[in-house]
Amino acid sequence: MPGVRERPDGRHVRGRDPGGNTDIPGAVIGKIAARAVGEVPGARSSRSRAARIRVSGEIVLLRLRIDVDYPLPVRRVAGAVREHVKSRVERITGKQVNHIDIEISELVR
């Protein structure tokens, strides 16, 4: 497989390794992101469609739906989620997360 190829729909990420290509499906990146959300105090992934992923080469763009514990400051929790998810996805996949949109779907007690 010479070169690095990717699907036009952006659902897979291919990276060149010395021994061959590593293919990371967008669904896997989404699961990594969803788990990382749950590691942030006061946040959890929304039950419905927790993550949308767009991949372009080595660049990952995420849109996350999260629930935030009431009465925590929503912007502070969202900022912590953004920082932690970026770090976790980049560390595990080796890809660069350029942008994370966060939608607050619910405040929970």
List where the protein language model places each region:
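Terminal low-complexity, intrinsically disordered regions
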Residues: M1-R44, R109
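Short, hydrophobic beta-strand segments
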Residues: V13-G20, V60-V68
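Residues at secondary-structure transition points
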Residues: D23-V28, D69-R76, A80
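Generic hydrophobic secondary-structure packing signal
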Residues: I29-A33, L62, V74
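Short, non-transmembrane amphipathic alpha-helical segments
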Residues: V74-T93, V97
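A short amphipathic beta-strand at an alpha->beta junction
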Residues: R91-R109
